Amino acid sequence: MPEKPEVMTVVKNLIPGIVGKRITDCAIYWDNIIASPTPKEFKKKIIGQKINSITTRGKFIVIELDDYSLLIHLRMEGKFFFRNKGDEITKHEHVEFILDNEISFRYHDVRKFGKMYLIPKEDTYKVKPLSELGKEFYDDITEDYLFDKIHKLKLPI
C-alpha cells in the first residue's frame, strides 16, 4: 500500500498534467472502483468539470473540481498513466478520463482494490471517508488538542 510520502509524490507528478484541464468524457471499465455515487451517476456528474487543484488528505488523493471533489484511494498499488485519446485500453486500466487537451488520464490497478468517491465540494471533509481521519503530520497539534483526544478515549491503560 502506498504510504503518505508516495501519495504526495503521485499528486506532485499529476499537478502539471491535470490541473486547469476540463474532463470532457469518462469511461468506467470496472464498476467496483467507483465507491460513490453509482458508476452511471459518477460519469454523468464528472463530465464537464474543470480540475482546479489536487492535494492529499491522509492517503487519499483529493481532486477539487468545479462542483465536486474526487477522492481516490490507491489501496495496494493503484497508479495513473497519461495516454493519447484513442490509445488502446490496457488490461488493468479501469477508469479513463478524457481531458480537454485530448489526453487520456487513466487509473490503472492490477488488483482492483482502489476506490473513487465523487462528493459535493462543500461536503468534502464533512462526510466519510475524510471525516474520520485525524490531523495531518503538518497540522498544528496543540497541548489542548492532545489533552482533549486522550481524555475522550475509553480504552483501558
State the predicted function of each range:
Residues L70-I157:
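Phosphate/anion-contacting hairpin/loop surfaces
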